[in-house]
């Protein structure tokens, strides 16, 4: 036993066998160099409390890893205690209340698989291996977010361990300030979530996907068309637009995908058809009404964003009312290279809703992200600079950034509204006055360690 830790609590010190393998348990193979003081893998609540006490005794910062999908590498902080929840697992559905409960290490795919037999649905992430911890805490840009809302809005309660090791349950009526923060604080959340309680909604009976691909030179016409149809596009349709080098065609192209959520007797043509009447000519390929499922979409996504690659990502919320076609033209046409892509996910009409009282507070009609995807570590600097060059060009039109897809180490931006920043800082000061858990997005005087 070292530092009075239980013998059965897996604790890896820097000189322990398996330390580096545990440190590098991340989706992004572009792994930050920071070395945690120790990596702890608890299996139950008591062991999480022991890990927190270790950090308190040693006066170390704490980082939490759920699924390891953070592209920015939030979980790696020099000389910290990394609490990896990979072995702390819970996933359950209560049919009497239609409430699911899940540990942060459960993934989007696992939650979806749990709910499918019950005919229930939560707008889980677009990547199946995204851990629910980071997903919910950062707001949760889930499936058909534009209509079904942010995933964190589905939370009805949270169990957690505080920065000093106490268990708390949080809801709108109990420890409400922590519950407020759990819905959007992201890496600044001042406690360790151990269980989410999630309301569910009826699932679609079936899904269809329609995909259309144009040469990238047609981007103006395609983007204009999407902007035109958004106000009337059926609420059960999720549109995604990607500009990339399309495998097989080996040309830069702009791709539009519609995922249609259907009841038993509905067809995709009924819901999507009216929006296709003004579709631009000149497609390279069309795939209409292809039956699919969330599970199948996850398999497809694994091919687009595999675990064995290096990623650099930055994203923006655009100010509403700008000339979106003109502002994004060069991005759509010139950014695609190799496997890199421009990803546009319109958020209208949910972007016009008054959000519930929660920490997640920054949204706009248009969300866009740039992804550099590559294998060679020698390209790290070049790829990062290239993304920032494109971002700097559009900076005057930017409202802020989605915390899950940002580059805080290189670009200062807005992640929350000004009012929420002040309130969130107060909550963090109350529950984590030693700043063991925060990742520096709130206070610019604290060093960014990702």
From Swiss-Prot:
<dbReference type="InterPro" id="IPR006094">
    <property type="entry name" value="Oxid_FAD_bind_N"/>
</dbReference>
<keyword id="KW-0274">FAD</keyword>
<dbReference type="GO" id="GO:0071949">
    <property type="term" value="F:FAD binding"/>
</dbReference>
<dbReference type="Pfam" id="PF01565">
    <property type="entry name" value="FAD_binding_4"/>
</dbReference>
<keyword id="KW-0285">Flavoprotein</keyword>
<comment type="similarity">
    <text>Belongs to the oxygen-dependent FAD-linked oxidoreductase family.</text>
</comment>
<protein>
    <recommendedName>
        <fullName>FAD-linked oxidoreductase ptmO</fullName>
        <ecNumber>1.1.1.-</ecNumber>
    </recommendedName>
</protein>
<dbReference type="InterPro" id="IPR016169">
    <property type="entry name" value="FAD-bd_PCMH_sub2"/>
</dbReference>
<dbReference type="InterPro" id="IPR050416">
    <property type="entry name" value="FAD-linked_Oxidoreductase"/>
</dbReference>
<dbReference type="InterPro" id="IPR016166">
    <property type="entry name" value="FAD-bd_PCMH"/>
</dbReference>
<comment type="function">
    <text>FAD-linked oxidoreductase; part of the gene cluster that mediates the biosynthesis of the indole diterpenes penitrems. The geranylgeranyl diphosphate (GGPP) synthase ptmG catalyzes the first step in penitrem biosynthesis via conversion of farnesyl pyrophosphate and isopentyl pyrophosphate into geranylgeranyl pyrophosphate (GGPP). Condensation of indole-3-glycerol phosphate with GGPP by the prenyl transferase ptmC then forms 3-geranylgeranylindole (3-GGI).</text>
</comment>
<dbReference type="InterPro" id="IPR036318">
    <property type="entry name" value="FAD-bd_PCMH-like_sf"/>
</dbReference>
<dbReference type="GO" id="GO:0016491">
    <property type="term" value="F:oxidoreductase activity"/>
</dbReference>
<comment type="pathway">
    <text>Secondary metabolite biosynthesis.</text>
</comment>
<dbReference type="InterPro" id="IPR016167">
    <property type="entry name" value="FAD-bd_PCMH_sub1"/>
</dbReference>
<feature type="domain" description="FAD-binding PCMH-type">
    <location>
        <begin position="32"/>
        <end position="203"/>
    </location>
</feature>
<keyword id="KW-0560">Oxidoreductase</keyword>
């Amino acid at each position: 036993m070292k530092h009075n830790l239980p013998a059965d609590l897996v604790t890896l010190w820097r000189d322990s066998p398996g330390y580096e393998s545990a440190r590098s348990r991340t989706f992004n193979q572009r792994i930050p160099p920071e070395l945690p003081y120790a990596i702890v893998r608890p299996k139950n609540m008591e062991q999480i409390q022991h890990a927190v006490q270790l950090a308190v005794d040693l006066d170390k910062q704490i980082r939490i890893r759920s699924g390891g999908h953070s592209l920015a590498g939030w979980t790696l902080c020099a000389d910290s205690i990394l609490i990896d929840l990979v072995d702390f697992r819970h996933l359950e559905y209560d049919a009497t209340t239609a409430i699911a409960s899940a540990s942060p290490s459960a993934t989007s795919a696992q939650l979806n698989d749990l709910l499918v037999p019950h005919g229930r649905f939560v707008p889980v992430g677009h990547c199946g291996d995204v851990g629910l911890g980071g997903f919910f805490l950062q707001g949760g840009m889930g499936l058909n977010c534009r209509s079904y809302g942010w995933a964190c809005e589905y939370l009805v309660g949270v169990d957690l361990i505080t920065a000093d090791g106490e268990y708390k349950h949080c809801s709108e009526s109990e420890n409400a300030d922590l519950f407020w923060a759990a819905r959007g604080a992201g890496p600044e959340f001042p406690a360790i979530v151990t269980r989410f309680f999630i309301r569910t909604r009826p699932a679609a009976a079936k899904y269809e996907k329609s995909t259309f691909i144009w040469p990238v030179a047609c981007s103006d016409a395609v983007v204009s068309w999407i902007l035109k149809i958004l106000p009337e596009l059926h609420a059960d349709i999720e549109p995604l637009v990607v500009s990339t080098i399309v495998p097989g065609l080996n040309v830069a192209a702009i791709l539009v995908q519609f995922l249609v959520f259907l009841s038993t007797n509905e067809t995709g043509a009924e819901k999507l058809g009216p929006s296709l009447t003004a579709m631009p000519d000149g497609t390279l390929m069309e795939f209409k009404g292809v039956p699919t499922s969330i599970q199948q979409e996850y398999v497809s996504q694994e091919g687009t964003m595999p675990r064995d690659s290096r990623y650099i990502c930055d994203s923006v919320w655009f100010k509403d009312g700008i000339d979106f076609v003109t502002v994004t033209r060069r991005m759509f046409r010139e950014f695609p290279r190799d496997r890199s892509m421009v990803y546009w996910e319109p958020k209208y009409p949910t972007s016009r809703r008054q959000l519930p009282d929660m920490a997640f507070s920054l949204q706009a009609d248009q969300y866009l992200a740039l992804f550099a995807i590559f294998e060679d570590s020698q390209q790290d600097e070049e790829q990062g600079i290239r993304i920032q060059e494109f971002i700097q060009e559009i900076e005057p039109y930017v409202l802020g950034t989605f915390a899950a897809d940002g580059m805080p180490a290189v670009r200062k931006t807005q992640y929350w509204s000004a009012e929420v920043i002040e309130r969130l800082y107060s909550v963090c000061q109350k529950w984590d006055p030693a700043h063991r858990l925060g990742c520096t997005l709130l206070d610019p005087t604290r060093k960014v360690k990702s």
